[in-house]
Swiss-Prot record:
Residues the record marks as carrying a glycan: N164
UniProt keyword terms in alphabetical order: Cytoplasmic vesicle, Disulfide bond, Extracellular matrix, Glycoprotein, Membrane, Secreted, Signal, Transmembrane, Transmembrane helix
Transmembrane domains' residue ranges: 374-394
Gene encoding the protein: Zpld1
Disulfide bonds: C44-C155, C79-C104, C235-C296, C255-C313
Residue ranges annotated as Extracellular topological domain: 20-373
InterPro entries: ZP-C, ZP-C_dom, ZP-N, ZP_dom
Protein name, UniProt field: Zona pellucida-like domain-containing protein 1
Domain ZP: 43-320
Feature type site, description Cleavage: R319, D320
């Protein structure tokens, strides 16, 4: 009997004249089916997590938008979604603000992952994973002929960002250095600034930074004496706070450097500094804003040995191999991965007057010597041709006028 009822319900749903989808933006030929995994889209945004569920398959299953709720909170209207019928197909949208994560029972799990070139606790990063589900209520009866719907979602963010997503988060690393007379611990920090004075830390507006805004970064060390300097080996960016993200863009590594990146100071003092112009990751093409996280693989080196660790770029020859054998084991520390972000960028506006923005104006057209000579020659040639044309016309005019005058001997016959 149950099978008969189920077949009857399916027959009603797929009938051509069915008013099942009402006025919603659905296609009976495409959406007369039960939901599948592809019917939910999850967007891990910079300020909120957004889920979009295919509403047409929800209708086909016998439910309405009020039957869907976050984490079984069907009695709380704040945990329900809303319909957007301006898309195809129509969708039910759920939005979770990062500032109110636990309002509808979402689950937050903190995990610790190693960074690039991990060296103990000095290179660990804490990641917060937010997960939950959207489902339909259980029927009050013992049995039901309607399928239960369940959609799962998950997003990961740096823990510092979840704690206060209105400010930039920067990580610090405690790095130990062994010397002949013992071991000391120094703390490294990666900070972002507004300009080259390195006085005011970078503030990200709620709408994000325009593309090509210049950002200044600094790695600073504490508890160091004058014998040790900071050396940045490798700095790169990722779209997430995970320094091991497969999607990354290198700013500088050895002699390879992004054209928009300028290394101001490295290996010469207890602070490393550089600047770069912000961009967006292509994977965020469907979003108005993009997140950029900065990571730097950093170490400490003795002031006398830092020049030996610096790459030799350009046409100069590589240092003699003997100079590389003079390092003692305690000449450098272990590596530490420092992170900062998110740097939120927007792509819907063009930078205008802003002291922090890179100049986007088109440079005035300038002529080089060769181009100027060619243009001058063409002008002179044109003037000569025009003068010759005028002279030719003048000669033709005089010849025509002379031919009209009749000269000769007087004929006596006509007298």
């Amino acid at each position: 009997m149950e099978r008969v009822w189920l077949l009857f319900l399916l027959a009603i749903r797929v009938s051509p004249g069915s008013a099942q989808f009402n006025s919603y933006n659905c296609d009976a030929n495409l959406h007369s089916r039960f939901p599948a995994e592809r019917d939910i889209s999850v967007y891990c945004g910079v300020q909120a997590i957004t889920m979009k569920i295919n509403f047409c398959t929800v209708l086909f299953s016998g439910y309405s938008e009020t039957d869907l709720a976050l984490n079984g909170r069907h009695g709380d209207s704040h945990c329900r979604g809303f319909i957007n019928n301006n898309t195809f197909p129509a969708v039910v949208i759920f939005i979770i603000n990062l500032s109110t994560l636990e309002g509808c029972g979402n689950n937050l799990v903190v995990s610790t992952i190693p960074g690039v070139g991990a060296s103990g606790n000095a290179t660990t990063v804490q990641i917060g994973n937010i997960s939950g589900y959207i489902d339909t209520p259980d029927p009050p009866a013992v049995i039901s002929y309607l399928p239960g719907l369940l959609y799962k979602f998950s997003c990961s963010y740096p823990l510092e960002y979840l704690v206060n997503n209105t400010q930039l988060a920067s990580s610090s690393a405690a790095i130990s250095v062994r010397e002949n007379n013992g071991t000391f611990v120094s703390t490294l920090n990666l900070l972002l600034y507004n300009d080259s004075t390195y006085r005011e830390q970078l503030i990200i507006p709620s709408i994000g930074l325009p593309l090509k805004t210049k950002v200044f970064a600094a790695v600073q060390a504490t508890n160091l004496d004058g014998r040790w300097n900071v050396l940045m080996d490798y700095c790169y960016t990722t779209p997430s706070g995970n320094p091991n993200d497969d999607t990354r863009y290198d700013l500088f590594l050895s002699c390879d450097k992004d054209p928009q990146t300028t290394v101001i100071e490295n290996g010469r003092s207890q602070r490393g500094r550089f600047s770069f112009e912000v961009f967006r990751f292509v994977k965020h093409k469907n979003q108005k804003m993009s997140t950029v996280f900065l990571h730097c693989l950093t170490k400490l080196c003795r002031a006398d040995d830092c020049p030996l660790l610096m790459p030799i770029c350009g046409n100069r020859k590589r240092r003699d191999a003997q100079s590389w054998t003079t390092w003692a084991p305690q000449s450098t520390s272990g590596n530490a991965v420092l992170s900062a972000g998110p740097i939120i960028t927007r792509s819907d506006e063009t930078p205008t007057n802003n002291s922090q923005l890179g100049s986007l104006s088109v440079p005035p057209f300038q002529l080089n010597a060769v181009t100027s000579s060619l243009i001058s020659g063409m002008v002179i040639l044109g003037v000569l041709c025009f003068s010759l044309l005028l002279c030719s016309l003048a000669l033709l005019h005089r010849k025509g006028s002379t031919s009209l005058v009749l000269n000769g001997v007087r004929n006596p016959v006509f007298e």
